[in-house]
Amino acid sequence: MIKYIVQGGTKLSGSVTISGAKNAAVAILPATLLVSGPCRIENVPDISDVRLLLEILRDMGAEIRRYGRNTLEIDCTRARNATAPIELVRRIRASYYLIGAELGRFGHAHVAMPGGCNFGVRPIDQHIKGFEAMGAMVEQSGGYVCADAPKGGLRGGHVYLDIVSVGATMNILLAAVLCSGMTIIENCAKEPHIVDLANFLNAMGAQISGAGTDVIKVRGVKALHGGCYSIIPDQIEAGTYMAAAAAVGGDVLIENVIPKHLDCITAKLREIGADITEYDDAIRVESAYRLHRANVKTMPYPGFPTDMQPQITVCLATAVGTRLVTEGVYDTRFRYTAELGRMGANIQVEGKTAIIDGVQTLRGCEVRACDLRAGAAMVIAAMCAEGMTLIEDAHFIERGYEDIVGKLTALGAHIRRIETYETPSVSEDAG
């Protein structure tokens, strides 16, 4: 079990380097199953979700070498089509990318339903719709998804996604790259990590066009070859440190970013009063005064990201006035507001909207991280608060943030990590 102890009240100052994108890495690692030969992947974030996926790939027979903290060489040439251990798959939502990758490589996939964060109904019906459009037979039974390609292999198909789905867009890409013919995916998600996955696959010999637009076309190829690739910086990690600097106050230079990916976050933080300067590959955030009020609605990219919703809510919790945060992607993502309420925040949730009446200060107490991004929000709130805060279940935070304690400590925060070796209780949002 992992806990953080945070002493609030210290402004942040200095620079922080952003790691590789979690949401790209957790799709690119399963994608190596499609490649004949070694893939050297740089800027891989050292986070627990990545470590779990590497365990799964090793169990399937992948040869994996690590060079330093953030470079991997993965060779899945001799990988076998095996059912991944359920105790690993159930701990990570992104394990569903194994379905597309295994179906594309072996023509068969048998994968346990994934775990990860739980903030509403997140079915995989759009993934299945895409696989079936390529001729696969898909069944869900006993907590598993079983998919089989037709005799002769997957064939190109035309898929219109009923909702904009990041996971479905990426999973269908994985299944389509080695199939025969052309696959067209309409109403695609456009997030930077989708473009990064497509760029990785193209670097290995795939023929994908249109990633980052509404329509992606995949012309199937017979094989992919090994190569080198560097994962893009993490948009959400960068946004989290931007929000922390704005909420806590101070002067922080956030390095190794792609400012274009952060446009909507930058615009909203400027609207609430942060002073932001953009450079070619860095962003500086300065904040010296109490933040202003602003309404926020999460949307698919290029809108304000749902993965930044808890962090911006913390910014508004101590801002002047009353404002609304509306969740436009998931059914519910406000469980963490009860934890903020324990710290003195005044937040009322009505359906998919949180009504926030800003308070002067938060106070330290004992809270828990209910999921990855909510956990990051708890850390920001704890740094804003008067006194000491104990954050339970901090293992959620380490699913997606590399060395968050070390990075924040370097910025002047007073935060300590405590790990005990109890067996964590099993819960529906474990992972």
PLM regions and their residue ranges:
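Short, structured segments at the rim of ligand-binding sites
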Residues: 1-431
